């Protein structure tokens, strides 16, 4: 193991649940406004997960007031308060970019049994 891997291993979080593209998550993000800190919930479907180690990121997509919103989070970021897996999705792709073009019921992902 080289020096960078050793440094990366110290800053990895161990409280991250197992999740994959297609899963629906509640991502609790710490937001600092002035002197106050609060937790903001971002609920959506994971459309991709990429990278490894400290640089690993995932993108969550939701539709808010008819507008698609995507947000990319670093997995091991200290600004993430917690991640909750709500449902497991049954998909056959690693990157779900095709959901950007789908509307209504077609954009729904089957739940894994």
From Swiss-Prot:
InterPro entries according to UniProt: Ribosomal_bL19, Ribosomal_bL19_CS, Ribosomal_bL19_sf, Translation_prot_SH3-like_sf
Output the Pfam families linked to this UniProt entry. Ribosomal_L19
Give the record's GO biological process terms. translation
Q: One GO molecular-function annotation for this sequence?
A: structural constituent of ribosome
Among PROSITE patterns, the record links this protein to: RIBOSOMAL_L19
Checking Gene3D superfamilies in the record gives: 2.30.30.790
Q: Which domain of life is it from?
A: Bacteria
Coiled-coil annotation: which residues?
none
Q: Which SUPFAM superfamilies match?
A: Translation proteins SH3-like domain
Q: Which cysteine pairs are joined by S-S bonds?
A: none
Cellular compartments per GO CC: cytosolic large ribosomal subunit
Q: Which UniProt keywords apply?
A: Ribonucleoprotein, Ribosomal protein
Record-stated family: Belongs to the bacterial ribosomal protein bL19 family.
Query: Which HAMAP family does the entry mention?
Result: Ribosomal_bL19
Q: Give the function comment from the record.
A: This protein is located at the 30S-50S ribosomal subunit interface and may play a role in the structure and function of the aminoacyl-tRNA binding site.
- What's the protein name? Large ribosomal subunit protein bL19
Task: Please report the organism this UniProt entry assigns to the protein.
Answer: Rhodococcus erythropolis (strain PR4 / NBRC 100887)
State the gene name recorded for this protein: rplS
